[in-house]
Amino acid sequence: FARTLIQVHYHARMGGVSVVMSRYARAFEQLRGRGPGANIVVCSPDQVRQRLPWPSVTRVDLPECAYRAFRSGASFDRVRARLRRRLEEVCDDPGHAGPICVVGHNLTLGKNLALTAAFADVARERGDVNFVSVVHDLAEEGRIDMLRRLRSVERWEPGIRRLMYPTLPNYRYVVLNRRLHRLFGAAGLDTGLLFNPVASRVTPDGGWISRDRLWEALAVTARRDGVLLDRAKPVVFYPVRILGRKNVAEAVLVACLLGGANLLVGGPGSSARDRRFMERLLTLCVRRGLPALFDVERARRRLGRDVGGGRMFPHLYHFADVCISTAVTEGFGYALYEPWAYGKAVRGRVPAGFSFQGGIDGGGLYRVLPVPIEWIDAARLERNYYRYINECFPGQWDGATFEDFREAFERTVITKGLIDFAMLDQDGQLAVLDRLAAAGNVAEPRMVRRAWGGRVPAGPEDTFDDRGRIDRNRRRVLRNLSGAAFRRAFQRQVLRGRPSRHGHHVDTGVFMKYFHTVQQIRLLQASGTAVAPGRKGRKIPA
């Protein structure tokens, strides 16, 4: 199998894809052993030219890999040519012994379509090298900015969709979940299914930070925000960045209001929109006295070297009484798997289209958190969805009026006067959260039954789950989703994988057809700028 692994991504900032890249690199190093070869990551330097904290990895900084939109065909062609030339140079480096495997992460998402095109160009020219496109997410899931970029680039590169999904004898796709595996199969793309590796070594270098010391650091950080954490309450940890699709307002509702617990959450995403939402959510929590700490890794400054060389998340897993996940969509869903490795139960929501891998028992999670429709401005919500769906999927439907859409929307997503909290936009979610907090959460027992299975935590020692299930899931995560099991799957799907068929008919339109319905789309999946005014005369099916 491959002696040189070259991973290509937009950046190496903290996040889910970077975690996957680091664990791919570690697995490759363990499989390769000694001898010639190389372990390479190609990405933009971003703000900091830091040394990658991964074993035996050489970083190749290529600024053109960064996120970018293009205003002209000339700029697109110029960046594409530069990227193609640099990727060829990395492949041709005499120190990079063959066979070579080049892995592109999320290049179908559209965050830099010149990088996507250059990756396909080099794959077409270098038949002696294996290329693997690892797909974590799809633009078609409702990522408006990515869809806009794709439509813009199509004006001067009409074949960009074929470059996103080429069919070549040395080009293969790998996806992270069964839903994407089914969709790629329906599109006619030769695709492997490879779960993401879950951490198997749970004790950080230097051991665990003491509970008292960690609690003090968290409490001081929270007080600087105007938030008072309550040591008498359980601690719930949501190990994600604050992004729209992570549905963090629901985590506040479930943990702080319905569960009577403290909540710890990671920092905001990289967009101004994510940071603004975190600030609005924090303002509400301060005003209503909700014990939620956002951007929790700031507490690291008060712990110094005690954290060791890694992130705080392992210490927070160990510290928390229970973990939560409320995301509306997930590529893999580390927050639904990794807590079990630390002996902690996971509560919250099952993402749309999600199914657990590795034999994990996901009992205790809900699929819908009902909210009375009279609590929100339903007409405003319907118009926002109408604009959003038309912006994401223009031309998908024949003519109909907004009234037709409203009828389909109400028939599909409103049941007995209730709507799922995750169907709301962020404004609607904050309004509901504020209403419940102001009322002292006495108005809606149905939400408690959905969120916690009929009960709230009794105290800090309450695991919200039976110990038998926690132990079983911990064993299954460590046996099936990490270590040797992952290395075997990684070797089969990535390092040795080649297409079983290519050059056949491919129809990636199935992605649009699947995601353009009211059942699949969520306003929380929007990213970047506001939704443009919708177009009239579109028929939007239920």
How should these model regions be labeled?
Residues 87-115, 129-134:
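Short N-terminal targeting/anchoring amphipathic segment
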Residues 1-51, 97, 123-129, 484-491, ...:
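N-terminal subdomain of nucleotide-sugar transferases
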Residues 6, 216-246, 252-255, 264-265, ...:
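Conserved donor-binding/catalytic core segment of Leloir-type glycosyltransferases
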Residues 121, 139, 149-172:
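Membrane-proximal helix-turn-helix segments that form the acceptor-binding/catalytic region
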Residues 46-47, 179-180, 194-209, 511:
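Short beta-strand->alpha-helix junction loop in the catalytic core
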Residues 13-14, 31-83, 109, 271-272:
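N-terminal strand-loop element at the rim of the active site
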Residues 233, 275-316, 322, 361-375:
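Nucleotide-activated donor-binding/catalytic signature segment of Leloir-type glycosyltransferases, i.e.
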Residues 328:
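Aromatic "clamp/platform" in nucleotide-sugar-dependent glycosyltransferases that forms part
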